């Protein structure tokens, strides 16, 4: 592992942030492509009910995956902080303790997704014609949830060490296997949504095997023993960071599931169109998401090294990068959303419904660059309780009520429902600006015990 590249406490902020962010972005692009391939192949070689099933089922899988990612952020932040503090000997206990905690999380998710797949599909208000396929998709993905959780745990460890290239390799393997699996099972054997789910789980399993092999062969800045694989003093530390982030992400993703349910009431074509739009949205959010993940590691390492001003400069650098890309994505989504939707479906009604949603959502491409950069900054500063609080305000007081209100109007449209996302994000930016002012003033006179 290149120590200079992994040292964020010196050198050009812009160059090092971009160098670290590009592999993170690459991994996110492949992950988005990974999910989009399922929808694309089912949309072209499966049925409309299968397309709706993958659309709804992937929303459930996204909820689980994003919550796990945020939970794992506690591990990333803690490892980066120990590197900044020059305490690599603590990292082995972090990794060992995290392995035990995430195994338990996997077991719980396995039970819920496998044995309650059909109730979940009904709760999501999946169209009647797609309920069975939706339940099948959720059940199969639940059966392989151990691999999905393991992949995100391993990725969080490498990113905490300042290595964003290895997770890129992990997801590249998964993406290649998933494409082959989708073509074989959906296009070849006509297994529809179930085939897409099997391909997803198989790809994650092979990716985890590859990641473990790479971890064993790499030269790491820490050692780990059998005694580290237990509940230890590091567990409460990464749990205190990760739990609040996971709860916030859970409620955020729950709001998107509720949004999916609101849309499903508008019919099968609206449901399928929304599913297509969500895949495009996933791509639109890639740069802000990469910034948020990169910012947390970058800022945490600098805070651990006592370089608070450098951490602050990183925030504004990230916002600038995000806004530049966000304006381009906004223009593309707003003006060519129908063309983008056409990549995932040949059904004219589905394409139009997708584009209708994207028109309302488009502004989110710009404002999220600001919000996610600020969230990454606060995560790196261990201000995860605030990140959770502002997320709850956005979700419970703005996004959900507004989306529901729009969905029950006599002239309800996907465009109006899509507006709920950028409106709630703008509220989040205002809240975070206020907290940034408070936090900056507080850092003028920090208490000695504030650093973890």
Task: Give the residues covered by each predicted segment.
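N-terminal transmembrane alpha-helices
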Residues: 8-40, 44-45, 59-74, 78, ...
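Transmembrane alpha-helix boundary and packing residues in multipass membrane permease domains
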Residues: 24, 28, 40, 77, ...
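Short runs within selected transmembrane alpha-helices of multi-pass transporters and secretion channels
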Residues: 72, 141-159, 167-175, 196-209, ...
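Small-residue-rich hydrophobic transmembrane alpha-helices
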Residues: 51-111, 148-167, 273-337, 368-390
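Helix-terminus/linker motif at the lipid-water interface of multi-pass membrane proteins
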Residues: 29, 33-52, 121-128, 184-191, ...
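Residue-level hotspots within pore-lining transmembrane alpha-helices
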Residues: 26, 30, 34, 64, ...
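Transmembrane helical elements of multi-pass membrane transporters/channels
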Residues: 19-38, 140, 174, 203-207, ...
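Short alpha-helical transmembrane segments in multi-pass integral membrane proteins
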Residues: 1-21, 79-146, 188-243, 299-364, ...
């Amino acid at each position: 592992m290149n120590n200079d590249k992994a040292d964020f406490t010196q050198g050009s902020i812009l160059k090092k942030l971009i160098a670290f962010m590009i592999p993170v972005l690459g991994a996110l692009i492949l992950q988005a492509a990974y999910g989009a391939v399922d929808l694309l192949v089912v949309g072209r070689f499966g049925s409309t009910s299968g397309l709706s099933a993958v659309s709804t089922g992937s929303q459930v899988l996204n909820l689980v995956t994003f919550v796990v990612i945020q939970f794992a952020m506690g591990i990333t932040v803690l490892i980066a902080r120990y590197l900044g503090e020059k305490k690599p000997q603590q990292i082995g206990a972090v990794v060992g303790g995290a392995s035990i905690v995430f195994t338990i999380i996997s077991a719980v998710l396995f039970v819920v997704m496998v044995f309650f797949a059909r109730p979940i599909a009904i709760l999501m208000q999946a169209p009647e014609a797609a309920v069975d396929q939706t339940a099948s998709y959720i059940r199969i993905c639940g059966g392989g949830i151990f691999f999905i959780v393991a992949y995100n745990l391993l990725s969080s460890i490498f990113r905490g060490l300042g290595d964003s290239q290895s997770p890129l390799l992990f997801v590249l393997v998964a993406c290649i296997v998933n494409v082959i699996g989708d073509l074989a099972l959906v296009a070849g054997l006509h297994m529809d949504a179930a085939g897409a789910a099997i391909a997803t789980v198989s790809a994650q399993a092979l990716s985890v095997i590859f990641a473990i092999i790479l971890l064993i062969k790499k030269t790491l800045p820490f050692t780990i023993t059998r005694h580290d694989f237990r509940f230890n003093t590091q567990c409460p530390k990464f749990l205190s960071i990760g739990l609040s982030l996971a709860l916030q992400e859970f409620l955020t993703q729950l709001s998107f599931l509720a949004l999916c349910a609101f849309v499903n009431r508008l019919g099968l074509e609206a449901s399928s169109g929304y599913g297509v739009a969500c895949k495009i949205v996933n791509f639109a959010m890639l740069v802000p998401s990469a910034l948020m993940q990169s910012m947390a590691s970058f800022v945490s390492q600098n805070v651990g090294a006592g370089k608070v001003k450098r951490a602050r400069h990183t925030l504004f650098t990230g916002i600038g990068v995000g806004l530049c890309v966000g304006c381009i994505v906004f223009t593309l989504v707003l003006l060519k959303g129908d063309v983008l939707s056409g990549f995932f479906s040949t059904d004219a009604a589905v394409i139009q419904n997708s584009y209708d949603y994207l028109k309302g959502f488009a502004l989110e491409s710009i404002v999220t660059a600001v919000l996610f950069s600020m969230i990454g900054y606060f995560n790196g500063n261990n201000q995860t309780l605030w990140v959770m609080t502002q997320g709850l305000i956005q979700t419970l007081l703005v996004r959900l009520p507004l989306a529901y209100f729009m969905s029950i109007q006599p002239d309800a449209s996907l465009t109006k429902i899509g507006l709920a996302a950028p409106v709630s994000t703008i509220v989040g930016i205002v809240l975070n600006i206020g907290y940034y002012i408070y936090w900056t003033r507080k850092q003028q006179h920090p208490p000695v015990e504030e650093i973890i």
